[in-house]
Amino acid sequence: MMATVTVLDYGSGNVRSAVRALERAGAEVTLSAKADDVLNADGLVVPGVGAFATVMKELKSVDALRMIGRRVAGGRPVLAICVGLQILFEAGVEHGNSEPGMGEWPGTVELLPADVVPHMGWNTVQAPADSMLFDGVRDERFYFVHSYGVQHWDFDVTQPKMKPPAVTWSEHGAKFIAAVENGPLCATQFHPEKSDDAGARLLKNWVDSLPATGRNQVA
């Protein structure tokens, strides 16, 4: 049985490349913002292009924040891309204005302190040895397009047996978070769908990790 994946359709630019890349990775893909598709797919992909505050507003307009939250609370796989990663943190600061994020992870999205922004092009990453997403592509380069990033990570593991998230880093002016793997909740700052063979392998790693049980109901 093929894993079912919904790419969240909320007006975030051209997502067709993500749909095609996920199909090549072996998923049955639906582009939708309908609750049935978002909640019941084996995996949900949250793309994001543009300003933090704008993306948050667009997600709210289709009730996506609640649906993403339900999936996370239910332990259902989610992969967020680019600004999709950023909105999972506590806040985003753009042009002096702070916008609350979903708060799944601690941290603030801020302008990268680099001479040239946006950070546009290929860059290497430093993935942890136990990374599922980067299995087979730890030494590869990925494609980034962003001006903002999370430059600090301070995750408090409150439960003794809780496994801390696997955090992957890259650098442009300063170190920033390139990816996070937190159980069923994963996110990348780069665009795997635009990252050639390395991105294709990463997406296949994620699709292969899905339960592939069809459209299960979320309680």
UniProtKB/Swiss-Prot annotation:
InterPro entries tied to this protein: Class_I_gatase-like (IPR029062), GATASE (IPR017926), Imidazole-glycPsynth_HisH (IPR010139)
Keywords from the UniProt entry: Amino-acid biosynthesis, Cytoplasm, Glutamine amidotransferase, Histidine biosynthesis, Hydrolase, Lyase
Cellular location(s): Cytoplasm
Keyword DNA repair listed: no
Classification via Pfam families: GATase (PF00117)
GO cellular component: cytoplasm
GO biological process entries: L-histidine biosynthetic process
GO MF annotation list: glutaminase activity; imidazoleglycerol-phosphate synthase activity; lyase activity
EC number: 4.3.2.10, 3.5.1.2
PROSITE patterns: GATASE_TYPE_1
Catalytic activity: 5-[(5-phospho-1-deoxy-D-ribulos-1-ylimino)methylamino]-1-(5-phospho-beta-D-ribosyl)imidazole-4-carboxamide + L-glutamine = D-erythro-1-(imidazol-4-yl)glycerol 3-phosphate + 5-amino-1-(5-phospho-beta-D-ribosyl)imidazole-4-carboxamide + L-glutamate + H(+); L-glutamine + H2O = L-glutamate + NH4(+)
Biological role: IGPS catalyzes the conversion of PRFAR and glutamine to IGP, AICAR and glutamate. The HisH subunit catalyzes the hydrolysis of glutamine to glutamate and ammonia as part of the synthesis of IGP and AICAR. The resulting ammonia molecule is channeled to the active site of HisF.
Name recorded for this polypeptide: Imidazole glycerol phosphate synthase subunit HisH
Species of origin: Renibacterium salmoninarum (strain ATCC 33209 / DSM 20767 / JCM 11484 / NBRC 15589 / NCIMB 2235)
